Swiss-Prot record:
Heme b binds at H88. It holds the Pfam family Globin. This is Hemoglobin subunit alpha. InterPro entries: Globin, Globin-like_sf, Globin/Proto, Hemoglobin_a-typ, Hemoglobin_oxygen_transport, Hemoglobin_pi. GO terms for molecular function: haptoglobin binding; heme binding; iron ion binding; organic acid binding; oxygen binding; oxygen carrier activity; peroxidase activity. The gene is hba. Residues 1-142 form the Globin domain. GO terms for cellular component: blood microparticle; haptoglobin-hemoglobin complex; hemoglobin complex. It comes from Electrophorus electricus.
Length: 142
């Protein structure tokens, strides 16, 4: 679980993301689809899965909205993300291993967008947070 200090670091860092959230989401999602092409199977109905496409940008924004929701529920991720977990488990049927793949890509992009702010301490707190988010999203699979 996250320590009080890690929660504080995540909240403070997330506060810096602000207007860049949509770009971060689009870049991370596009990167995931490129680096891990097997993840494209969940989006087979989309006509354009290339980085920067309208669909990728739109879903990147959706992802970042979910992460912002998680930051808001940082003290109860399982409860706060229950509906997202249910959606991904029962309707979308996403393999929960993909949450960790997306988390990795988000970390890479956050480091690229905020090189001065993404210190080892921030990296550690954000990584733990994303692992907790992945676990909470996997809850309905159990």
């Amino acid at each position: 679980s996250l320590t009080a200090k890690s929660k504080s670091i995540v909240k403070a860092f997330w506060g810096k993301i602000g207007s860049r959230a949509d770009d971060i989401g689009a870049e991370a999602f596009g990167r995931m689809l490129t680096v891990y092409p097997e993840t494209k199977t969940y989006f087979a109905s989309w006509s354009d899965l290339s980085p920067g496409s309208a669909a990728v940008k739109k879903h990147g924004k959706t992802i970042m909205g979910g992460i912002a929701e998680a930051v808001g529920h940082i003290d109860d991720l399982t409860g706060g993300l229950a509906s997202l977990s249910e959606l991904h488990a029962f309707k979308l049927r996403v393999d929960p291993a993909n949450f960790k793949i997306l988390a990795h890509n988000l970390i890479v992009v956050l480091a690229l967008f905020f090189p001065a702010d993404f210190t080892p301490e921030v990296h550690m707190a954000v990584d733990k947070f994303f692992q907790n988010v992945a676990s909470a999203l996997s809850e309905k699979y159990r």
